[in-house]
Amino acid sequence: KNSNRLYPCFETEEELALKKKSLLSSGKPPIYDRSSFNLSKDEIDKKISSGLKPHWRFKLDEKIITWNDLIKGKVSFDTKNLSDPVLIREDGSLLYHLPSVIDDIQENISHIIRGEDHISNTAYHIQIFEAFGSTIPEFAHHPFLTDDQGKGFSKRLGSLSIDSFKNEGFENIALLNYLLFIGSSKNIEPIKNLKDIIDKFEIKSISNSSAKFSKE
């Protein structure tokens, strides 16, 4: 906040939706226009005094954010194509970005491995790490496992779960064996203990494309 990276915004959800609709109808990307960033201290104080509660956005530095993803390879985002992310809601609750980065810093996390749906979040997180003056971890974004029709598994849709395998009598070591090799170019081979599975795991062997899984 003291470095002018965190700033209050007063637009309602309806106002933001109208801005987004207007930009899209004009053929422009729905990027937040930073109108609240330009408010003076007096203007901010008046809005708060009138009862308006701000949400808080993180101002992105205008540059190309690049990292060497351990699965995807070189990934780049131009911040001019990204909206400043909201970090704190009107009620004071935190969105995912800020506590995620703070937790990684406090726990000295060296590698962050997560689904490819978080790739754009990583662009935000790298700048938040930089704002804190912290070391940026290594990142790896894995593709999602799909069924034999190419559809993603979903807990909401009652898809497969670890418990379902357990209830059907599958041994955990068998499932770990399968997960070690699926989506890689390696042939599946039986490994009987967890240490050997860990020793054989290589993140660079994970395919950049979604692997298909059939229970049959």
Language-model features: locations:
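Active-site cores that bind ATP or allylic diphosphates and position pyrophosphate for catalysis
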Residues: 2-141, 146-155, 161-162, 186
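Catalytic adenosine-cofactor/nucleotide-binding cores of aminoacyl-tRNA synthetases and other
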Residues: 120, 132-216
